[in-house]
Structures are given as C-alpha cells and as structure tokens.
C-alpha cells in the first residue's frame, strides 16, 4: 500500500532530513559535466537518485551504459554479519515447573490462544543487508515480501556516493562506496504488551505480539523494533541511535517523530529506573514470602 511504500522520490524532502540528523549530505554525482553528462547541477536530483538506487535503479551506472533509470543487475546488498532468522507460527514453550518461569507467564496470559490464531502464519526469513535494508523473504518460495530501511540507517546512506567513481571505474563504469548498514542479526520474541494498532493508536490492554529487534551491528550504535505479528503488515514501533559524536541519543517513534535526548553527566544505574525499582520491589516481596 502507499502507506507502507513510502521510500519514494515524492518524499525526498523528508528523507533528506534524515541525512541531516547524522550530519551527512548528498554529493553532486550526476550533472552536465560528469560521466554521462546526465542530471543537473546541485544535489536535488541526486537525493532522488539515491532513493531510486535504494529501490533498485542503476543510478550510479554500474554497467556503464549511461541508462540510470534501468533496474541494475544485482539489487540486493550483501548480507555479511547479519544472521538469518525465520519466523513462522508461534512456538514458545508453555510447559513449566515453577510459577517464576516464563512459560508460566505465557500460560497465565493465554499464549495458547495466540498460538492457535497464528498457527497458519506465513513463514518469513528476515535478514539485514549492507545496502541499508532489512529484507523480509518468503520461506516458501524465496520472494521478497517487503524491505524496511530503518530511519537512522537511512541517515547514513549518503556515504555510498563517491564522485570519483563517476565514469572512472573499469574505463567508463560507475560505482558506489560499500558501507556497513543493517549489519546486525535480527532477534525475535513473543511479547505480552500494549501494542500499536495499524491506525497508530496504542492498544487499551495488553496482548501477545511477535517483536523483531534489528541491531545495526557495524552499521552504527542503534537498533529498530518492528511488530511482525502479521508479517505482511509490519509496524515500526521505535528506533534508537546512540550518537556519541554529538553526545545525544536519537529516538524515532511509531509515528515517525524524531526527538533528541542529550547526554547527562553523572552516574546512573538501571536500579534507578522505574523498571529497576519495580524489579527490586518484586524481588524483596518474593524473598519475604520464601522466608
């Protein structure tokens, strides 16, 4: 749908702002005096060209034929450090011996019903690539269902542009810089929580969801979280990027809003967080009951 298919040239201004968050700018790769003499001076056409490149076009003229609107021979980037993970029907354990086990929590909160409702769920393979895309691939026939470019990985994409490659590789072929992007291995877990509805609103009560965590690995100190309960209608929950160059943490929420959290000086501990305080209270309460 158009709601999902949003990495397009019509959204170039919004996508270009993602570059600015990480202090990258697009270089003027194509203009009247370079390579094939295509494009115009300035970077407006190159921002759109980079977007089209991510969608499979040969904007950097890999084959040297000066046709930058054709689909290039190899579209998918390398899957290097990212391990593949397959997600099909829910399969978490429901057998428990003690009430402090995770299996007891699942049984108590009707995980069996979640299992039944998703028994026939499409089996999907998820893998991160260094072209900047998390790929969702049908385990049945190998076709790609969709691709997701995390917002803070999108901010890194101008790095692939190298004007020195314009017409100077192998005689007259173009090229681009290889980078690390979505280089970490996805992690999947079924979580009982108040999820996000397709409308963008938060559920009024908790339910089971299949959550996919996407670390960027060598692509940068960040990660994205998707709800893939319905693998054909994924939902972006949030993304976090630790920008240690500018001493801040960037957070993108489920509505696409990006906020900046500056580093605070001083000492902090997880025990001081709301979750840490609650965990300590639960521990002390359980200890008193044992005594």
Say what each PLM segment does.
Residues 1-291:
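A fold-level detector for beta-propeller and closely related beta-sheet-rich head/sensor domains
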């Amino acid at each position: 749908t158009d709601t999902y298919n949003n990495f397009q040239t019509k959204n170039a201004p919004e996508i270009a702002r993602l570059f600015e968050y990480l202090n990258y700018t697009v270089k003027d790769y194509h203009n009247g005096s370079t390579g094939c003499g295509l494009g115009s001076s300035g970077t407006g056409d190159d921002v759109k060209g980079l977007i089209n490149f991510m969608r499979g076009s040969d904007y950097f003229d890999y084959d040297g034929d000066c046709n930058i609107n054709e689909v290039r021979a190899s579209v998918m980037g390398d899957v290097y450090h990212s391990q593949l993970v397959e997600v099909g029907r829910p399969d978490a354990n429901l057998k428990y011996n003690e009430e402090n086990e995770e299996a007891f929590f699942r049984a108590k909160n009707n995980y069996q019903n979640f299992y039944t409702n998703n028994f026939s769920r499409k089996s999907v393979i998820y893998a991160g690539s260094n072209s900047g895309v998390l790929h969702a691939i049908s385990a049945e026939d190998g076709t790609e269902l969709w691709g997701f470019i995390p917002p803070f990985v999108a901010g890194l994409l101008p790095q692939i542009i190298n004007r020195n490659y314009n017409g100077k590789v192998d005689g007259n072929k173009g090229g681009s810089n290889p980078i690390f992007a979505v280089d970490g291995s996805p992690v999947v877990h079924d979580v009982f929580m108040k999820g996000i509805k397709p409308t963008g609103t938060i559920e009024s009560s908790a339910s089971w969801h299949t959550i996919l965590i996407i670390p960027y690995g060598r692509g940068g100190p960040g990660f994205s979280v998707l709800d893939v309960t319905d693998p054909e209608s994924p939902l972006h929950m949030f993304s976090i990027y630790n920008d240690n160059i500018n001493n801040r943490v960037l957070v993108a929420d489920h509505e696409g809003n990006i906020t900046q959290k500056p580093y605070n000086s001083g000492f902090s501990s997880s025990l001081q967080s709301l979750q840490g305080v609650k965990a300590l209270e639960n521990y002390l309460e359980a200890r008193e009951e044992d005594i």
